[in-house]
């Protein structure tokens, strides 16, 4: 399994750019602020003098891509493409794990659920300025979630939770998760009189 996929068009683009560089120059792919919400990926030239001992080298047709050891796990499943659109051509870099490191299939349930929330659910809620934090997973199999940002106190929270988030999580973790609860509802349920 290749760690990073570079399309044929993007490879041709890199080869063309590298022709005008000093011999032995390759490319470097990196992540700035990896594992944070403001992670950003980039590509730069990598002359031979810039290759570090702990870099990983991925060989492509006519050039290599070097990745530093900190960026490496965050670039898993990344894809680089060179797309031609009406306004011209553009290099696109998609790195689904840049903001959060990919979690192993056999990792504890709470880590796997948190990964899905951070990489799939929160990006959807971000357009409303909202986000979800996983607080815990109860012994009886419920994910306890805290809604924050624009979601906090929003009357649509219940709908979002039940129809969107809970449904998605239960489908993905079939047999492991029974459902999801909002922490406010969870707290109210444990020590309230009404």
Curated annotation (Swiss-Prot):
Keywords: 4Fe-4S, Iron, Iron-sulfur, Metal-binding
Domain of life: Bacteria
Cofactor(s) it depends on: [4Fe-4S] cluster
Pfam families attached to this UniProt entry: Fe-S_biosyn, NifU
GO MF annotations in UniProt: 4 iron, 4 sulfur cluster binding; iron ion binding
Residues reported to bind [4Fe-4S] cluster: 151, 154
Record carries keyword 4Fe-4S: yes
Cofactor binding, note field: Binds 1 [4Fe-4S] cluster per subunit. The cluster is presumably bound at the interface of two monomers.
InterPro entries (alphabetical): Fe/S_biogenesis_protein_NfuA (IPR017726), FeS_biogenesis (IPR000361), FSCA_dom_sf (IPR034904), HesB-like_dom_sf (IPR035903), NIF_FeS_clus_asmbl_NifU_C (IPR001075)
Any one of the GO BP annotations: protein maturation
Summary of the function given for this chain in its UniProt record: Involved in iron-sulfur cluster biogenesis. Binds a 4Fe-4S cluster, can transfer this cluster to apoproteins, and thereby intervenes in the maturation of Fe/S proteins. Could also act as a scaffold/chaperone for damaged Fe/S proteins.
Subunit-level organization: Homodimer.
Family that this chain belongs to: Belongs to the NfuA family.
Matches recorded under PANTHER family: FE_S BIOGENESIS PROTEIN NFUA, IRON-SULFUR CLUSTER SCAFFOLD PROTEIN NFU-RELATED
Protein name: Fe/S biogenesis protein NfuA
Native source organism of the sequence: Actinobacillus succinogenes (strain ATCC 55618 / DSM 22257 / CCUG 43843 / 130Z)
Record lineage: Bacteria, Pseudomonadati, Pseudomonadota, Gammaproteobacteria, Pasteurellales
């Amino acid at each position: 399994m290749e760690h990073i996929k570079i399309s044929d068009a993007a490879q041709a683009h890199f080869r063309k750019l590298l022709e005008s560089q000093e011999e032995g120059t390759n490319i470097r792919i990196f992540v700035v602020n990896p594992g944070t919400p403001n992670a950003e990926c980039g590509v730069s030239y990598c002359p031979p003098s810039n290759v570090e001992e702990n870099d990983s080298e991925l060989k492509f047709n006519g050039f290599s891509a070097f990745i530093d050891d900190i960026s490496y796990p965050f670039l898993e499943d990344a894809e680089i493409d060179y797309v031609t659109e009406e306004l011209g051509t553009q290099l696109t870099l998609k790195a689904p794990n840049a903001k959060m490191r990919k979690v192993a299939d056999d990792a504890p349930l709470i880590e796997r659920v948190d990964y899905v929330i951070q990489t799939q659910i929160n990006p959807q809620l971000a357009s409303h300025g909202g986000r979800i934090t996983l607080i815990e997973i109860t012994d009886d199999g419920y994910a306890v979630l805290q809604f924050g940002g624009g979601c906090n106190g929003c009357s649509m929270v219940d709908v979002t939770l039940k129809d969107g988030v809970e449904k998605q999580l239960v489908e993905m973790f079939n047999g492991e998760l029974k459902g999801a609860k909002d922490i406010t509802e969870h707290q109210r349920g444990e020590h309230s009189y009404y």
